[in-house]
């Protein structure tokens, strides 16, 4: 965001001044909890960035955004290398068939050698190719760039093209990335801004717009997230997969009353959006995360689901049944919770991923309802 001029200075999550981690819980903890949208532009490409949580307890929040991605940027710490959660994210990207760009950060720290890290990454996937080289605080393109791409593709036609021409066209590389024949990997330091320009140049050169031919089709979209704004308005966050959507259009029996394009916590309203755009709409009171709306019915099942069930209780002076009606909206925003009422025991049941999610949910309920819930040990 800083490199493309969206921000005048780079934010740091531990300083609480990032554009996207604007929720108070995110700023106080220094982690991303909720996925956020930002708009930026490179010389050739307008990009919508969806920033997602990296903590394992919020994997379901991350997975919801995978349903609407054209490309993913997977950030890996050079110090931590490939962790168990990295493998989970990788599996999800494979499940959703999403083309991936890798960015290995913290290369400026001692003992982080690109050759060692690249070898470990290529043991993980032989499709990974270094698209930049990090040496003593600078980034450049390697001399065997095209050869590495051709070898990783394992495609005889591409190998022959390289042998004959000594290079590969941007269009050829675009196709290989889109078809997941290769996975470009960039190296640098996000904190110091090293290598970020190389990644942006790669996104500019090697991504394609698949929606230009779909704007005239009947409107169809995917709902990937439900939230409520500070005034309680219900927002359906959607990716327009085809066609055009305008304010006052009817979807089923509901009318779109507003279309918002968010940039961090701020937004602008627009009259119309077309295929390929991500936006938030008001007026949709029944659509749920994962739904296809309009002329789009593809409805993927979530791969990540919590497996631990918890019982929520409150102070004796608080009606648990009443609290259930107040917090039921959370189930729309976080469907992985599977919030339910147990009539025989008159308790609230919920599914959660881990202790950090419990802490966040406790704070959410306190903020919205003014009471503090108690969770049992789970089963």
Language-model segments: residues:
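Structural and coupling elements of P-loop NTPases
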Residues: 1-379
């Amino acid at each position: 965001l800083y490199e493309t001029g969206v921000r005048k200075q780079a934010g740091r999550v531990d300083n609480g001044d990032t554009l996207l981690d604007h929720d108070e819980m995110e700023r106080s903890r220094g982690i991303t909890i909720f996925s956020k949208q930002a708009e930026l532009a490179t010389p050739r490409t307008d990009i919508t960035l969806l920033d997602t949580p990296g903590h394992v307890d919020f994997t379901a929040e991350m997975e919801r955004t995978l349903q609407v991605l054209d490309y993913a940027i997977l950030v890996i710490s050079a110090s931590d290398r490939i962790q168990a959660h990295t493998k989970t994210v990788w599996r999800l990207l494979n499940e959703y068939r999403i083309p991936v760009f890798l960015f290995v950060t913290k290369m400026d720290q001692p003992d982080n050698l690109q050759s060692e890290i690249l070898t470990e990454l290529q043991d993980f996937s032989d499709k990974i190719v270094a698209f930049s080289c990090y040496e003593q605080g600078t980034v450049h393109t390697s001399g065997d760039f095209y050869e590495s791409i051709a070898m990783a593709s394992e495609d005889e036609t591409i190998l022959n093209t390289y042998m004959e021409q000594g290079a590969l066209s941007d269009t050829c590389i675009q196709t290989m990335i889109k078809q997941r024949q290769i996975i470009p990997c960039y190296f640098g330091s996000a904190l110091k801004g090293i290598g970020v320009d190389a990644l942006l140049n790669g996104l500019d050169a090697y991504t394609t717009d698949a929606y230009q031919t779909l704007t005239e089709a009947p409107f169809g979209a995917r709902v990937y997230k439900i939230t409520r704004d500070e005034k309680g308005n219900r927002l359906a966050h959607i990716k327009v997969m085809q066609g055009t959507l305008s304010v006052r259009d009817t979807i089923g029996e509901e009318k779109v009353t507003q279309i918002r394009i968010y940039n961090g916590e701020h937004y602008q309203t627009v009259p119309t959006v077309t295929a390929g755009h991500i936006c938030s709409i008001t007026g949709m009171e029944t659509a749920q995360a994962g739904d296809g709306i309009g002329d789009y019915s593809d409805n993927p099942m979530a791969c990540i689901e919590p497996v631990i069930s918890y019982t929520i209780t409150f102070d004796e002076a608080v009606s648990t049944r009443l609290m259930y009606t107040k917090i039921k909206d959370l189930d729309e925003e976080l469907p992985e919770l599977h919030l339910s009422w147990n009539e025989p025991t008159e308790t609230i049941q919920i599914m959660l991923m881990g202790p950090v999610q419990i802490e966040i949910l406790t704070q959410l309920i306190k903020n919205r309802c003014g009471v503090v819930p108690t969770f049992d040990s789970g089963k």
